[in-house]
């Protein structure tokens, strides 16, 4: 944690959940059924690894990587609906815990909604095509933050999520 982090936050227990692998069902509702056990471990904060849809283009393996985000403003339908996630967060809060989510704001999947709606938000290779600066990460394309409209898009995304969750882990 940062040196200026509020003292009360420094000794909190954070429990990481990757929804897809947390239970056999791999859903928000299944995680909700496990909250009593998670709380009994002394958990103060549940941190969800990326909960957004996973891109299909160039995906790694049969399931793809959750860090190849397809849409910043919704949940992975394999995990459940946005309402399912909101309900899960309400249950987390009812048990006296907080909730944070991963935000992966350096790149998206090549087939992300942003690559279609805002191609100007992306880094381009010398040939003009989308690309990334880490060659073996073929399932992602890098964002280009020299475009200030991208900053506003991401701020708006964070504001949307901040109405639901308590914080973020920035990847």
Model-assigned labels for residue ranges:
Residues 15, 171:
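Rossmann-like NAD(H)/NADP(H) cofactor-binding core
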